[in-house]
């Protein structure tokens, strides 16, 4: 834990202070955004690693429907064993301004009990948007980055085998209209809501284009007057998105991942003076089988019982005084002095926040 905190502090300490950034790096143009697509399909050509008919009956039904659509009549009541076929969900991202014929990458994820999608081919499948309309058609060979093997009841696996990617596997068939060329104004949406940054962005835009070209609606939204002609509007946006803006100073923030024990903090975090007592309590349970063997002629039965031994170990807590830290390196040194595990450190940081010693917002994900 100490090693990783020290490495993080060195990396963050090497970063320069908050400097000017391009407007395109801190704000998005309203209405210019990607759209998520989703679909359902069948991956065929698997070498016996597909779905099982007993646990994934929908795969067999999908195969029958597909064959019927292709003109192959399947007699009613026919059971199909889809061991070489896997049912998958398809996901893709439709970028803004996508045109018909543009290719998209597709991710295929097994929804049955297929062991692997390696070597499979996705059959032609529609990709729909949130409105239920078809925006792309997907088909192609599935590329799986993992590997696995099994023999004699033992198996090993590297990375995921039930998720694959189809590079350039979908073709855009429907375009999404944007409101970029409509109206007198366009809207800039800051990625992080902040009144200071919004005010500085407005001043920087008006300094370049003059007059009242831009005005702040709130801490996130900026309204900008733009030319009506599409070509002039593109030139205008090209100039505007490269304007340098000084963002507001970062708010002190500590982010904790409770599942992995990861802790990340920014350079604005400081500590107030406090004292922390830290100790550990561990409980160990050992089960030992005990066999009761009766005499041969007694008519009794052999009985196996478990004897449980429970041991509780407690390490004495120590009180560590933490001095107030004015920069990230001092905060890291103070936390390293505790000698706590990542999970213990989460509880300590929460207690320090409640005591008012941690001068930062605490966000647990």
UniProtKB/Swiss-Prot annotation:
- The signal peptide, as residue positions, is 1-19
Q: PANTHER family of this UniProt entry?
A: FLAGELLAR P-RING PERIPLASMIC PROTEIN FLGI (PTHR30381), FLAGELLAR P-RING PROTEIN (PTHR30381:SF0)
Q: What is its main location?
A: periplasm
Protein name per UniProt: Flagellar P-ring protein 2
Question: Which organism is the protein's source?
Answer: Chromobacterium violaceum (strain ATCC 12472 / DSM 30191 / JCM 1249 / CCUG 213 / NBRC 12614 / NCIMB 9131 / NCTC 9757 / MK)
Cellular compartments per GO CC: bacterial-type flagellum basal body, distal rod, P ring; outer membrane-bounded periplasmic space
GO MF entry, a single one: structural molecule activity
Tell me the InterPro entries matching this sequence: Flag_FlgI
Q: Which domain of life is it from?
A: Bacteria
**Record keywords: Signal included?**
yes
Q: Which gene encodes it?
A: flgI2
Q: Name one GO biological process term.
A: bacterial-type flagellum-dependent cell motility
Q: Where found?
A: Periplasm; Bacterial flagellum basal body
**Pfam name, any one:** FlgI
The family note in this entry says: Belongs to the FlgI family.
Oligomeric form and interacting partners = The basal body constitutes a major portion of the flagellar organelle and consists of four rings (L,P,S, and M) mounted on a central rod.
HAMAP family for this protein: FlgI
